[in-house]
Structure formats: structure tokens, C-alpha cells
């Protein structure tokens, strides 16, 4: 039986495979990385293989990555992408469920003007 970490990695590989297969208009991918204590997000451009913007609870000097701080991270990344005039994105949960901290981050990003 596979461990939870292996299962999450396999789910994430499937998600990335689907994103690459269906992302024909080369939208930016918001990739969420969740650890036990912190949360971070990167805006990837898969066509050029570069990170356009990133934000994390560590970079914002937040104490932890709880739901309130995840909202702040979502607002920060949304502000950075709106400044770059990138509003249409694809959201990648990183193999985790769309629940809790990840949902809070996504909703905060939507409120600031991102479409996904």
C-alpha cells in the first residue's frame, strides 16, 4: 500500500499531465505547495518553463499557514498577477483536496480579480 505522500504525488502528476494536455491557450498555472506549517503558491508559465510570480507565508513573514494567512497569500499572488496583466489562470492544488487552506487561498485570489 502506498503512503499518503506517494498518493498525493501521483495525484499531482495526473493533474499536471491534464493541465499540460488541455492548456492550449497557454494560461498561467497557479501551483499551490502546502507544508505542515506554511503555504506557498507559484505562477508558472509552462510554455517557457519559468516562474512569473510567487508568494508564501514565509515570504510575507507570517507565523504559520493557517486559513487566515492563506487568504493573505492568495491576495498577494493575485495582486502580483493583476499587476502583470495576467488574470486568466489554471489552479493546481498540488494533489491536495480543494478544502481548507487551499480553498481559502483560491477564494481570496478570485476576490482580487483572478479567473479560474
Swiss-Prot record:
The gene is rplR. Coiled coil: none annotated. This is Large ribosomal subunit protein uL18. Part of the 50S ribosomal subunit; part of the 5S rRNA/L5/L18/L25 subcomplex. Contacts the 5S and 23S rRNAs. PANTHER family: 39S RIBOSOMAL PROTEIN L18, MITOCHONDRIAL (PTHR12899), LARGE RIBOSOMAL SUBUNIT PROTEIN UL18M (PTHR12899:SF3). One of its GO terms (molecular function) is structural constituent of ribosome. It comes from the Bacteria. Belongs to the universal ribosomal protein uL18 family.
Amino acid at each position: 500500500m502506498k503512503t499518503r505522500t506517494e498518493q498525493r504525488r501521483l495525484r499531482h502528476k495526473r493533474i499536471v499531465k491534464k493541465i499540460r494536455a488541455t492548456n492550449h491557450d497557454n494560461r498561467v498555472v497557479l501551483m499551490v505547495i502546502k507544508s505542515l506549517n506554511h503555504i506557498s503558491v507559484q505562477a508558472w508559465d509552462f510554455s517557457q518553463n519559468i516562474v512569473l510570480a510567487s508568494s508564501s507565508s514565509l515570504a510575507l513573514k507570517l507565523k504559520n499557514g493557517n486559513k487566515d494567512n492563506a487568504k493573505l497569500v492568495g491576495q498577494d499572488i493575485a495582486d502580483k498577477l493583476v499587476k502583470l496583466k495576467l488574470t486568466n489562470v489554471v489552479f493546481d492544488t498540488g494533489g491536495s483536496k480543494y478544502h481548507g487552506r487551499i480553498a481559502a487561498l483560491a477564494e481570496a485570489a478570485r476576490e482580487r480579480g483572478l479567473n479560474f
